[in-house]
Amino acid sequence: MSFQDRTAEFQACVTKTRSRLRTTTANQAVGGPDQTKHQKSEFTRIAQKIANQINQTGEKLQKLSQLAKRKTLFDDRPVEIQELTFQIKQSLSSLNSDIASLQQVVKGNRNKPAQMNQHSENVVVSLQNSLANTSMTFKDILEIRTQNMKASQNRTEKFVASSSMNANPLINSGNSISPFADYNDPKPEANEDYLSLNLGDGANTRYEQMALLESQTDTYSQQRMSSIQNIESTITELGGIFSQLAQMVSEQRETVQRIDMHTDDIVSNIGSAQREIVKFYERMSSNRALLFKIFGIVIIFFLLWVLVT
Amino acid sequence: MSQEDAFYGKGSYGASSGNSNIPPQGFQPVYPVAGQLDNTAPYVGAVAEGTAEGIVSNGEYAVGAMGAAPTNIIGSVDQQPPVSHTSHKSRRQYPAEVFELTNTLAASPAPPSLSEPSYVMARTPSSSPYPHDRAEVGTKSLSAQFGGMSLGADGAAAMPTNELVSVDLYNQTPEISDLTSPPPPINLPLSYSATGAATSNCPPKYVRSTINCVPTTNSLLKKSKIPFALVIRPYTSLVEEDDPVPVVTDTIISRCRRCRMYINPFSIFIDNGHRYRCNSCGIVNEVPQSYDWDSFRNVQRDRWQRPELNYAVVDFIAPQEYMVRAPQPLVYVFLIDISFVSISSGMVGTASRAILESLDRIPNKEGRAKVAFIGVDSALHFFSVSPGAEEATQLVVSDLEEPFLPRNQDLLLNLRECRQGIENLLERFQSMFATTRDSSNALGPGLKAAHRLIENIGGKICCLISSLPNVGVGKLELREDPKLLGTNRESSLLHPNDSFYKSFAVECSTSQVSVDMFLFSSQYQDVATLSCLPRYTSGKTQFYHRWNASRSEDALKFASELTNYLSMEIELEAVMRVRGSNGLRMSSFYGNFFNRSSDLCAFPSFPRDQSYVVEVVIEDTITKPFVSFQTAMLHTTCNGERRIRVLTISLPTTNSMTDLYASADQVAIAQYLTVRASEKALSSTLNEARDSIISKLVEILEVYKKNLAGQNTGAAIPLQISTNLRLLPLLCLALTKHTGFRRSSHISSDLRSIALCYLSTLPTPLLMRYIYPTLYSLHDMPIEAGTVTEQGVVLPSALNLTSALLQSFGLYLVDTHIHQFLYIGKDAVPQLLIDAFGVNSLADLKAGRFTMPVIDNPLNVRINAILGKLRSLDKGSTIMPSLYLVRGDGDPQLRSWFFSHFVEDRSENSPSYLQFLQTLKEKVRD
């Protein structure tokens, strides 16, 4: 904590001092006439109220000053400034009329002692000076606000211009009006519920049909635009796919070469196998007589076995 | 009246006992007094502590002590079941009274066997003779009983209940002004608090309960079917000065030694102020010795002026034992996608210029804030600035498998020391990559590198991404399938597609790193997967649909939101806990955070524009007249100060379902249903989410019909609900028709995902506008609407969202807080167009994203004032709504989007409000 708020102590001290002074004033005023005392109290009360209101207006002015002096882009609170301006304007006008009324009261009491009149006039002049200073401050703040608004507008325009300059308007340019008209093929909705609201008027039927035709034309254009967008994205994806394919093909060159060599080996091996099979076939053909003999023996044995049983 | 009845009943018991002459039943007449004494105990304590005079305080304390002892004696007798007597005669009252006195005196010999009476006996003068002590005890117990009864009477008079008024939902148009009305009042007398300050209980903008009257048993809560939850919004403004709360600066923090609840306005001081009784668990705690001493000024201070005893929402400045390390500085790491799409759409240029404009608005009072910039495409581009240097050095890391930091220092830039270098870097950031043709996006490796950069400190990673990550870890595929939209399998598109983002979120949360996502879409962006990081690291997800900087509306919206985001005074390394009174337990937590243990929510950084929902379970029967909930959030401010924000809300208890329904808050219930349905949509299916909303509403209507509605024997049974819940069906219907939950084949998964993100994080006033947008009529608004008065800019009255109110020649404004729509009917007269927009015909108005022109015309000035007022209604939001112009004869898709906000009308898949009520009526009848 870099500082300590001792406002409460100060206010307590002020309260004590004020009460002490009030006691002294009461003692002095014992001998005065009641009417004069009452009149002075009324005057002092009104003056004090006006002074308090001027102070409150000053506080609002301070807050307005803070808001108006903000120069950072996007740090603008126009509604808050507008509201504060309205309140301050109202306060200033009401204070002005209050001070005028107070001045009338002072003029109406010309028969008072000269010293008291001088004091009253001094109080009125002092209040008028405070109000004038507050009004001047208000005017200065409004001027600053106007300048800052112009500067902020210029900077905003520069900001937008630089952003636009950097951006490619073609990207995301279509279908900006509705977030639901993207990614998909938009199917034109009939919207009977909404269109039928106006069909009660017979006079509007013709215009409604024309509007519907116009909508259909717009829908057709939007459809074509969406299709083109889809084709564009598909082509982009295909480009990526082909790039990956080329990369895979280059990576697999050695593998393909080895496969080719293995294929040649396979061909020669198959040739050798074929020659062996041909030899075996010839040997099997020459042994045909032996097969017949074995087959005959088996049949004879079978017949004997059957006769015995 | 109730007290007299109780007294009379007691008399009847006494009479019967006298007649029967049965000694064991001699204790029955004392039974009814026990409850009253127990209920009024807090009064005795409060009164005792409220008095400053020592003499009177001692006397009151003695009465309180005596009041406790008889309660214990009677408590032991309470175990016997009460015996009911049906016969009584009025002429027996006087003898019964005498008998009661005899009984009380007869009970006196029992105390020596109990510990509490011994405590009481110890306080009597030891020099007194024993018979005198006995007589004194008897006398004081009698006075305690009578005192308790009188206090009970005062309590009954001081605790009015909310009136239960039934309305027939069919016979009236929904009163949408209820959405902005205050919730049902919490009828808790201020005498329960230590100081009686009007700010002792929590205002609804911070903590809002679904029921402002808590049932004493879980069975009553279950029978009522009303969910019990708290909606907590610890901050209501982006910067502290817009909504300051009292700060306790002397680091004297007193907490209950058992339940650890902080001292609060409802703590009960006893023992002449030296001790206090915890309002949560009832245990007695010591007050710190220095509690009444102002060590800075060396004077005695008034205890009752301490902020934590007068305000329900306070900030404590934490002492040393609440810190585990030096306070963390504010750190932002900007992960900027510099792929071809980002450069072409203008995102990189707009972002760098917006950050440049925001450097003065980042909170940096102590000069400790740090920033870092990492460009992401097929490689990682780091930028190094030495302190005092005027130029930045770019360091490119091409290794994406194991991304490393190319330099040990000067990558994390102190905002004040490296200011010139940062400014030069941001000015040339766009031109550095203007000629890129690289379409890669290595977001995963970039996140890993950023995490490695700040994992020892903590901070925020701000991702600005325009394309789908397609390189390295965490790359995502194009899985959007239009054929799945509107079917049951659509829910799979809302689930995360890659486990990297969940596991990385856990790593970030552990090292106090928070991730925010700003997503700009050219095509599919997979918001469902990328929003996992913000969800578990207490960040946020922003989505800019088909964004292009050449449209000034897009550029200004993003720049405004980014600067608001950077100027927010976030809290760092925060943990939040919600504690409740005995018998209450927090069961579920909803929002963007990481649940570290069962009831501790961890926030690497705490944003000021979100809210959280906590569900409450009643575990034990509540015996006190009120319960308290305390939300404590220990955090480090962005200015390096360790603080604890404490929000305390106390709610009265009841055992009446009528009181329960009369105190229900429809807005809080709607918010609870919203966040629960959002979680269901993300964890299971959209159908279950929609069904959970409708089924809860049907349950509430069933209970109301069976238990609370008037006995209606007519043939036509009305659909009734209490006045304070009459908008709940409309809010549930609007919720099921919302972008996040509506059954439709035209809502892409990205739009649905971002809608669910908003639904689960928006604070209550903004969420209500998001669910049920506000409709204003501008062509015939009152003369004072749009003008500035003492109360600020006057808004016109809100209309119901039904297109029956729309005229074909009118001008209307719909505000959802995220978007604003101006609808101009096709039959608008040229004078209206000239006054409002400065154009002569409808053909001159360009539909779509729109900037309201500023011309010197009263109607235009008023409309601009209304638009500005709506944008600044809530100081706790970073969102700047997009304005769209919809023409009555314009684009059908834009019009269907506009009319989809009219939730009281029938649409393709949803019923109208009256049809919805008919459906509810049929379900309730079953």
Curated annotation (Swiss-Prot), chain A:
Cellular location(s): Membrane; Golgi apparatus membrane
Chain's role = Required for vesicular transport between the endoplasmic reticulum and the Golgi complex. Acts as a target organelle soluble NSF attachment protein receptor (t-SNARE).
Coiled coil regions, renumbered to chain: 37-66
Query: Which Pfam families is this protein grouped with?
Result: SNARE, Syntaxin-5_N
The family note in this entry says: Belongs to the syntaxin family.
t-SNARE coiled-coil homology domain: which residues? 218-280
Q: Which residues lie on this side of the membrane: Vesicular?
A: 309
User: Which gene carries the instructions for this protein?
Assistant: sed5
How does the record say this protein sits in the membrane?
Single-pass type IV membrane protein
The record's InterPro entries line, in alphabetical order, gives: SNARE, Syntaxin, Syntaxin-5_N, T_SNARE_dom
The name this protein goes by in its record: Integral membrane protein sed5
Q: Which domain of life is it from?
A: Eukaryota
According to its record, what are the GO cellular component terms? cis-Golgi network; endomembrane system; Golgi membrane; SNARE complex
Under Gene Ontology molecular function, one entry of this record is:
SNAP receptor activity
Species of origin: Schizosaccharomyces pombe (strain 972 / ATCC 24843)
- Per the record, what ranges lie on the membrane's Cytoplasmic side? 1-288
From Swiss-Prot, chain B:
Would you kindly state one Gene Ontology biological process term found in this protein's UniProt entry?
A: COPII-coated vesicle cargo loading
Spell out the Polar residues composition-biased ranges: 73-85
Annotated segments matching region Zinc finger-like: 255-281
Provide the binding site for Zn(2+).
Answer: C256, C259, C278, C281
Q: Name one GO molecular function term.
A: SNARE binding
Keywords assigned by UniProt, alphabetized:
Cytoplasm, Cytoplasmic vesicle, Endoplasmic reticulum, ER-Golgi transport, Golgi apparatus, Membrane, Metal-binding, Protein transport, Transport, Zinc
Q: Which InterPro entries match?
A: ADF-H/Gelsolin-like_dom_sf (IPR029006), Gelsolin-like_dom (IPR007123), Gelsolin-like_dom_sf (IPR036180), Sec23/24_helical_dom (IPR006900), Sec23/24_helical_dom_sf (IPR036175), Sec23/24_trunk_dom (IPR006896), Sec23_24_beta_S (IPR012990), SEC23_SEC24_subfamily (IPR050550)
Entry membrane topology: Peripheral membrane protein
Write down a Pfam family by its short name.
Sec23_trunk
Region (Disordered) residue ranges read 1-21, 73-93, 107-134
The intrachain disulfides are none
> Any idea where this protein resides?
Cytoplasm; Cytoplasmic vesicle, COPII-coated vesicle membrane; Endoplasmic reticulum membrane; Golgi apparatus membrane
Can you supply one Gene Ontology CC term for this chain's record?
equatorial cell cortex
What this protein is reported to do is described as: Component of the coat protein complex II (COPII) which promotes the formation of transport vesicles from the endoplasmic reticulum (ER). The coat has two main functions, the physical deformation of the endoplasmic reticulum membrane into vesicles and the selection of cargo molecules.
The record's similarity note reads: Belongs to the SEC23/SEC24 family. SEC24 subfamily.
Q: Which PANTHER family match?
A: SEC24-RELATED PROTEIN, SECRETORY 24AB, ISOFORM A
Q: How does it assemble?
A: The COPII coat is composed of at least 5 proteins: the SEC23/24 complex, the SEC13/31 complex, and the protein SAR1.
Question: What name goes with this protein?
Answer: Protein transport protein sec24
Q: Which organism is it from?
A: Schizosaccharomyces pombe (strain 972 / ATCC 24843) (Fission yeast)
Q: Which taxonomic lineage is given here?
A: Eukaryota, Fungi, Dikarya, Ascomycota, Taphrinomycotina
